[in-house]
Design a protein with these regions (language model features):
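Active-site and NAD+-binding cores of ADP-ribose-processing enzymes
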Residues: 1-14, 18-44, 69-193
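Extended catalytic/binding region for NAD+/ADP-ribose chemistry, centered on the ART fold
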Residues: 42-68, 139-142
Length: 193
């Protein structure tokens, strides 16, 4: 097989044939399951992929900004601009809901899931993710820990997602210590002769 194509596809054997998706947007969906983060993530110990998304651009920026900040500080990166693509997709599966409660139920849920929603320690959330995935769960939704008004989803199975497509391109400016600003990139403009 062509090594370049193999690198683009990732480790396809991580996804069972019946869970694989194809067609428009499939590469974007499958990438989360075939290109693993060896360090793990909120709901994965690094041995399997999870497709993470946020309900809004503001929440996505907060979540991505946090994780990129951790990486850029750890690698002591100088000022730079990071280009990101906003992807929209439909979640077409029933998810375990850690975010949907209101009133008293919301308070009880917050107490019950406090360890799972810890902003820095992922031990409890990785245990929960492993248990839910092993039980065949499609994924879960939870209140963002980086944006108090936001919600996130973590999808364990590619077939839960449909119609993934690029919606916008944004750039986040890293000033060497933090993200100072972001902007949406517009369409191309012809350069005058």
């Amino acid at each position: 097989a062509n090594p370049r194509v193999r690198d683009e596809i990732g480790e396809l054997s991580l996804v069972s044939p019946e869970e694989r998706v194809s067609g428009p947007g499939a590469t974007t969906i499958m990438a989360a399951f075939t290109h693993l983060n060896a360090e793990g993530s909120r709901f994965s110990d690094g041995s399997y992929g999870v497709y993470y998304a946020a309900h809004s651009l503001a929440t996505a920026r907060a979540e991505v900004g946090h994780h990129r900040t951790v990486f850029l500080r750890r690698t002591d990166e100088p000022a730079l601009e990071i280009d990101l693509r906003l992807i929209t997709a439909n979640v077409e599966a029933e998810l375990h809901d850690l975010a949907g409660a209101e009133g008293e139920a919301a308070l009880r849920a917050a107490q019950r899931f406090a360890a799972v929603l810890d902003p820095d320690d992922y031990a409890a959330s990785q245990r929960l993710g492993r248990q839910l995935r092993a039980a065949g769960s499609w994924g879960l939704r939870w209140p963002s820990v980086r944006d108090p008004r936001g919600e996130c989803v973590g999808i364990f199975r590619p077939r839960a997602l449909r119609h993934a497509k690029a919606a916008a391109h944004i750039a986040m400016h890293w000033d060497g210590t933090r993200f100072s600003h972001w902007y949406e990139k517009g369409g191309p403009h012809t350069v005058g002769v």
